[in-house]
């Protein structure tokens, strides 16, 4: 019996050490050397060195002086991330979308972009399309007393063009860029 049990237990201990200790330490070490910013959460810092968020996780922005992210089914909490899972036929989804559209309709002209009314699969997608950002530009320009062409130039500079997929704008980095402008309102804090 011990001739079978001993090698089996030895293998369990060895594989536990390899897969539970050695492999994670090697991967963490390689990540810290090769991709330190990404390995530490893609954190974004303001000019004072204070962490303002992650480039990978959306945040809620309120106030006309900010570009707003798409809605979150989990109130932008990473622990409760995920979609609402409401079926298209669910009245609760229709009610939420109608209420959100009514709130946003006063902010700009034209129909509200779909990305500002629907949650992403994770509920934490930090990106919006340049069109959804441009739709909000008039409201932000008026609140910050900025010329619209200056704001559009900032949007263009913040637009990311991935190798695969459509162009996107990270809402947090765009809002952080707004605070770098000389006309940033004194009360506008992220």
UniProtKB/Swiss-Prot annotation:
Assigned keywords, A-Z: ATP-binding, Cell inner membrane, Cell membrane, Ion transport, Membrane, Nucleotide-binding, Potassium, Potassium transport, Transmembrane, Transmembrane helix, Transport
Molecular function via GO: ATP binding; P-type potassium transmembrane transporter activity
Principal location listed in the UniProt entry: membrane
Gene Ontology CC annotations of this record: plasma membrane
Membrane topology category: Single-pass membrane protein
InterPro entries: KdpC
Subcellular location: Cell inner membrane
A Pfam family assignment: KdpC
The UniProt record lists the keyword Transport: yes
Entry's transmembrane regions: 11-31
Cytoplasm listed as a keyword: no
Lineage top rank: taxon: Bacteria
Subunit: The system is composed of three essential subunits: KdpA, KdpB and KdpC.
Family stated for the protein in its record: Belongs to the KdpC family.
Record function comment: Part of the high-affinity ATP-driven potassium transport (or Kdp) system, which catalyzes the hydrolysis of ATP coupled with the electrogenic transport of potassium into the cytoplasm. This subunit acts as a catalytic chaperone that increases the ATP-binding affinity of the ATP-hydrolyzing subunit KdpB by the formation of a transient KdpB/KdpC/ATP ternary complex.
Database matches in NCBIfam families: kdpC, PRK00315.1
Name by which UniProt lists this protein: Potassium-transporting ATPase KdpC subunit
